[in-house]
Amino acid sequence: MSRKNEFISIALLASPLILASVAPALASSGGSLPWEGPLEQIQESITGPVAGYIALAAVAIAGGMLIFGGELNDFARRLMYVVLVAGILLGATTIVGLFGATGASIGLTNDRATSTRPSAEGEGAHG
């Protein structure tokens, strides 16, 4: 048997053992990442009720300045547009929450899934 064939056969025999010993190390999870905590706090601050009130006040004040502000210079007008858009973006999550949308819902839950069994209520009760 040549040296090359011997090396290939040893490698083929050893590879399942090596892969089996590495699998637990690859499957372990390190927990959460260090930046997830602060990002979750920012997200909770932006989507809370206080942020909704701040967004409403920002939209009202910026809109009032743009409508009744008279002669604003270009910088002040652009600043009011930025405040107006920021208020709308902060308030958008609150507005979506008012309509009952809390997150993605893919598929039906078990209690809402249609059943193939006849129902004992309503028109399904034949007897």
Curated annotation (Swiss-Prot):
The chain crosses the membrane at residues 7-27, 50-70, 79-99. Keywords: Cell membrane, Conjugation, Membrane, Plasmid, Transmembrane, Transmembrane helix. The keyword Transmembrane helix applies. It is found in: Cell membrane. Its main location: membrane. The keyword Ion transport does not apply. One of its GO terms (cellular component) is plasma membrane. Pfam families: TrbC (PF04956). It is a multi-pass membrane protein. InterPro entries: TrbC/VirB2 (IPR007039). It comes from the Bacteria. Signal peptide: none annotated. Belongs to the TrbC family. This is Probable conjugal transfer protein TrbC. The lineage of its organism: Bacteria, Pseudomonadati, Pseudomonadota, Alphaproteobacteria, Hyphomicrobiales.
